[in-house]
A protein has these predicted regions:
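Positively charged n-region of N-terminal signal peptides that target proteins for export
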Residues: 1-4
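Short beta-strand micro-motifs enriched in acidic
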Residues: 65-69
């Protein structure tokens, strides 16, 4: 019995030791003023299949914030990624028909910043300069 307990405890501790912190991402894009109400309306009632796909792709604590700066609207997305292969999960999401349908609705609302647009992307990356756990 003691040996079984030790084996179980060792397995449990090993599982805890390999658990990694989520990788945090913050992305930014512009929001077209004439489409802001539509964008907010879409996100007030997102497609359930899209939310499921986000979770299947190991994304948690996902939020999008809106901010006006110098008369222009911007969106800031925060998410935590808990998977092992971000690129593969993003390809999986991009291949999902319901997500594609969703993006056909949301993409026209967004105004990519020049650096993101040059890469054919909607959202641009940001650099973390401080983190307090």
């Amino acid at each position: 019995m003691r040996t079984l307990f030790c084996l179980l405890l060792t397995a449990l501790l090993a599982g805890c030791a390999t658990r990694q912190e989520p990788k945090r991402y913050v992305w930014v894009t512009g929001l077209r003023p004439e489409k802001a109400a539509r964008y907010e309306e879409l996100h007030a009632n997102p497609l359930p299949a899209v939310n499921r796909m986000i979770k299947e792709c190991h994304i948690q604590n996902f939020s999008i914030r809106e901010r006006e700066i110098d008369g222009k609207l911007y969106l800031f997305a925060y998410l935590e990624y808990t998977g092992k292969d971000f690129d593969a999960d993003m390809k999986k999401m991009a291949a999902d028909p319901e997500t594609q349908r969703w993006w056909k609705e949301t993409d026209p609302c967004q105004a990519p910043l020049p650096d993101a647009a040059a890469k054919g992307k909607i959202w641009g990356d940001t650099k973390e300069v401080y983190y307090l756990k």
